[in-house]
Amino acid sequence: MKEIKVIIAGPRGRMGHEAVLLMERTEHFNLVAAVDYKHGGEKISDLPGMPALHAPIYADLHTCLDEVEADVLLDLTTPEVGKQHVTLAVERGLRSVIGTTGFTEEELTRLTENAKEKAVGTIIAPNFAIGAVLMMKFSQMAAKYFQDVEVIELHHDQKLDAPSGTAVKTVELIRQNRESKQQGHPNEVEQLAGARGANVDGIHIHSVRLPGLIAHQEVMFGGDGQMLTVRHDSFNRASFMSGVKLSIETVMNLDHLVYGLENIID
């Protein structure tokens, strides 16, 4: 396979560290630079626990793109920084794979239009774990037969956004096979604000943040005399790397934006 030159934004995070290791062990991936505002001017190998890769680190993406030739930006930063980075990547005509979440429908619409206009491949993935993508697809299938559903997502206590992008994407897929319906008793009253969780078109999402967790989600369907639960668990961040690898390889052949890995797997 042809070499793919990659820039990683956010190499010091746990996902970023796993992605650097992915670069090291994948023959056709070449890590040409990284972006980290705290370590501009250093090299990847200077960071604690990193392999002996000598890709330069830039403090900002603008400077990096001015000085480095790359095929793909892999962004594993924070929601706000990720939004800035993907916008800049599209403007510069650079393919990108975005692992941050928190995009609004309006932001996705604007990015989709811009990527189409520039004919630049872009993948935004709420979750890179293949099992999580299948969990979302199975939930979408089940919604055709079970109209009563709630989502419980559980993540580590350092996660910045709630609900998770995976939960929001799951609900979006379920809505495609489910008529709008308010879940629960029509006259129910919350004795404490937020007791029933977030409400998206009548579907409740409950967010848990605790140390010891990584990324987990249950989609619970209820029917007459039965329950169906679709669950996925990521026990470490290595679980996301197969999806990262697939996304980097796939985005090379795209000329538009794709939201969600379910749209690129068979």
From Swiss-Prot:
MF GO annotations: 4-hydroxy-tetrahydrodipicolinate reductase; NAD binding; NADP binding; oxidoreductase activity, acting on CH or CH2 groups, NAD or NADP as acceptor
One Pfam entry name: DapB_N
Keyword entries, A-Z: Amino-acid biosynthesis, Cytoplasm, Diaminopimelate biosynthesis, Lysine biosynthesis, NAD, NADP, Oxidoreductase
EC number per UniProt: 1.17.1.8
InterPro entries: DapB_C, DapB_N, DapB_N_CS, DHDPR_bac, NAD(P)-bd_dom_sf
SUPFAM superfamilies reported for this sequence: Glyceraldehyde-3-phosphate dehydrogenase-like, C-terminal domain, NAD(P)-binding Rossmann-fold domains
Gene Ontology cellular component list: cytosol
Annotated transmembrane regions: none
Active site: H155 (proton donor/acceptor), K159 (proton donor)
Source organism superkingdom: Bacteria
Positions that bind NADP(+): K38
Catalyzed reactions: (S)-2,3,4,5-tetrahydrodipicolinate + NAD(+) + H2O = (2S,4S)-4-hydroxy-2,3,4,5-tetrahydrodipicolinate + NADH + H(+); (S)-2,3,4,5-tetrahydrodipicolinate + NADP(+) + H2O = (2S,4S)-4-hydroxy-2,3,4,5-tetrahydrodipicolinate + NADPH + H(+)
Residues the entry annotates as binding NAD(+): G10, P11, R12, G13, R14, M15, G99, T100, T101, A125, P126, N127, F128
Enzyme class, broadest EC rank: oxidoreductase
Binding-site positions, (S)-2,3,4,5-tetrahydrodipicolinate: H156, G165, T166
Record GO biological process: diaminopimelate biosynthetic process; lysine biosynthetic process via diaminopimelate
UniProt keyword RNA-binding present: no
Keyword Oxidoreductase: yes
Broad class of the protein's primary localization: cytoplasm
Signal peptide range: none
Pathway(s) where this gene product acts: Amino-acid biosynthesis; L-lysine biosynthesis via DAP pathway; (S)-tetrahydrodipicolinate from L-aspartate: step 4/4
Family: Belongs to the DapB family.
Classification via NCBIfam families: dapB
PANTHER family cross-referenced by the UniProt entry: 4-HYDROXY-TETRAHYDRODIPICOLINATE REDUCTASE 1, CHLOROPLASTIC-RELATED (PTHR20836:SF0), DIHYDRODIPICOLINATE REDUCTASE (PTHR20836)
Name this polypeptide is given: 4-hydroxy-tetrahydrodipicolinate reductase
Species of the source: Bacillus cereus (strain ATCC 14579 / DSM 31 / CCUG 7414 / JCM 2152 / NBRC 15305 / NCIMB 9373 / NCTC 2599 / NRRL B-3711)
Gene for this chain: dapB
